[in-house]
């Protein structure tokens, strides 16, 4: 009998979780399908694979990365720790709770290096088109260095390309004549560019909070945040203000809905991202808002209208790496015949039920527990190592409280690992004073 062939699109955290899931089954003696992972970048890690580039890459492809220098985790690492590969195992000791970008990339890479899955990835290979042909998928890709296009046949396709790389870019009158710089968070790379400048941030997402904090930390003159519905409401520094929605820009002056104005040197649009899958035809393409209960995905992963197609990591996220693991193990077991999918009507009812339950939640705490329950639900159906999901939810709740108490100091707190039970040490330098975010300096605890 011919082995099934599986195409994984993307080698970021969710794609790497899927590779690890299959490798885990093989390590236990199971016969796994033939796996091919296509990755547009020349290295794994997805968004965590930092690049200085913006706009287009060396091959004329849209730059995938939205990562910037000096980024530190904006949530405790205890909420994302791999159940099968702890921070202590990787670093040989417990580390502080809010690692910088380079530290988290090192951790992500460590697990897949140990698993030995790099040979399953075709790097610098962009997926151009996926179409259903009978009971198979034809996947057309381009090897970018050679500009060579070819098509291969697969039994299943797993989309792991993420949803934080195609920016949502609104227009405001006057942008075309603004004398400063207008950019989306996707193209933000270095807070030092905005030293001694008055910056305007449009949006109240996590990127607004974090990019504003970065610019404050590295010496911008002032931060003004424009909100559409409500301010973030934290206890910001004196040179930080929140105002209603931007209406227009004239010269260097920004005009807001309440009639106030502010002269600014730069506008940073922290206005979110789009689920964007240009390689998929309309009947296979996921169309969903950024929410916990995604549209058209049974158990949050199986595409209802074509259940041989899966999407990983498409939810809005409290949980990240460990949720991708839970999803990847579950998808693996469906493909390997360990879990049977129900009929389409049952899957559609599941989607509706998840949306209804999410909508019934009244606040962020309800959302945290909602997603925690989802992670537990998937883990209970596979052999993924169980871990203290409730403890992770409690860490997220503490994190929310720490941010409310001190938005510029919340990263100075420590939490207990839900995998090993070890308490994280306090970092050797308060976040606002830690200007060197290198791996070597961070690990000097």
From Swiss-Prot:
Catalytic activity: trimethylamine + NADPH + O2 = trimethylamine N-oxide + NADP(+) + H2O
Annotated InterPro entries: FAD/NAD-bd_sf (IPR036188), Flavin_mOase (IPR000960), Flavin_mOase-like (IPR020946), FMO-like (IPR050346)
Keyword Cytoplasm among UniProt keywords: no
Family assignment from sequence similarity: Belongs to the FMO family.
Binding-site list for NADP(+): 72, 74, 204-205, 207, 228, 411
Name recorded for this polypeptide: Trimethylamine monooxygenase
One MF annotation (Gene Ontology) recorded for this entry: NADP binding
Gene from which the chain derives: tmm
Residues annotated for FAD binding in this entry: 14, 39, 41, 47-48, 64, 74, 127, 317, 320
Obligatory cofactor(s): FAD
The organism's taxonomic lineage, starting at the top: Bacteria, Pseudomonadati, Pseudomonadota, Alphaproteobacteria, Rhodobacterales
Coiled coil: none
Enzyme Commission code: 1.14.13.148
Alphabetically ordered keywords of this record: FAD, Flavoprotein, Monooxygenase, NADP, Oxidoreductase
Organism: Roseovarius sp. (strain 217)
Domain of life: Bacteria
Disulfide bonds: none
Main function: Catalyzes the oxidation of trimethylamine (TMA) to produce trimethylamine N-oxide (TMAO). In vitro, has a broad substrate specificity, oxidizing many nitrogen- and sulfur-containing compounds, including dimethylamine (DMA), dimethylsulfide (DMS) and dimethylsulfoxide (DMSO).
């Amino acid at each position: 009998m011919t082995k099934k062939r599986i195409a994984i699109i993307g080698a970021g955290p969710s794609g790497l979780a899927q590779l690890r899931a299959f490798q885990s089954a093989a390590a236990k003696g199971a016969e796994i399908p033939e796996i091919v992972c296509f990755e547009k970048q020349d290295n794994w890690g997805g968004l965590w694979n930092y690049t200085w580039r913006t706009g287009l890459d060396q091959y004329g492809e849209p730059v995938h990365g939205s990562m910037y220098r000096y980024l530190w985790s904006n949530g405790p690492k205890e909420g994302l720790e791999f159940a099968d590969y702890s921070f202590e195992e990787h670093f040989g000791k417990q580390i502080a709770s809010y690692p910088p970008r380079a530290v988290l990339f090192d951790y992500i890479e460590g697990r897949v290096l140990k698993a030995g899955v790099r040979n399953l990835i075709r790097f610098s290979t962009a997926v151009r088109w996926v179409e259903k042909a009978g009971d198979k998928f034809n996947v057309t890709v381009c090897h970018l260095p050679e500009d060579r296009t070819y098509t291969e046949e697969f039994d299943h396709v797993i989309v792991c390309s993420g949803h934080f790389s195609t920016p949502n870019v609104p227009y405001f009158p006057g942008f075309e004549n603004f004398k400063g710089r207008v950019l989306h968070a996707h193209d933000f790379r270095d807070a030092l560019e905005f030293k001694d400048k008055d910056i305007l941030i449009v949006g109240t997402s996590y990127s607004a909070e974090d990019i504003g904090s970065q610019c404050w930390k590295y010496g911008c003159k002032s931060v003004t945040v424009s909100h559409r519905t409500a301010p973030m409401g934290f206890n910001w520094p004196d040179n930080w203000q929140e105002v209603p929605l931007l209406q227009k820009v004239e010269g260097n002056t920004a005009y807001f809905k309440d009639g106030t104005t502010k002269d600014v040197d730069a506008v940073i649009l922290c206005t979110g991202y789009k689920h964007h899958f240009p390689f998929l035809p309309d009947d296979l393409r996921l169309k969903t808002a950024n929410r916990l209960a995604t549209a058209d995905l049974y158990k949050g992963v199986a595409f209802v209208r074509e259940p041989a197609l899966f999407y990983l990591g498409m939810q809005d996220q409290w949980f990240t790496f460990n949720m991708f693991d839970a999803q990847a193990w579950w998808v693996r077991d469906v493909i390997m015949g360990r879990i049977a999918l129900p009929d389409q009507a049952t899957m559609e009812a599941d989607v509706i039920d998840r949306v209804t339950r999410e909508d019934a939640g009244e606040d962020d705490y309800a959302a945290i527990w909602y997603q925690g329950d989802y992670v537990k639900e998937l883990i209970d159906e596979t052999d993924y190592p169980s871990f203290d999901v409730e403890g992770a939810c409690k860490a997220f709740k503490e994190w929310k409280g720490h941010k409310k108490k001190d938005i510029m100091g919340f990263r100075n707190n420590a939490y207990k690992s839900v995998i090993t039970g070890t308490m994280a040490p306090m970092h050797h330098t308060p976040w606002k004073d830690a200007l060197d975010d290198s791996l070597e300096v961070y690990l000097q605890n």
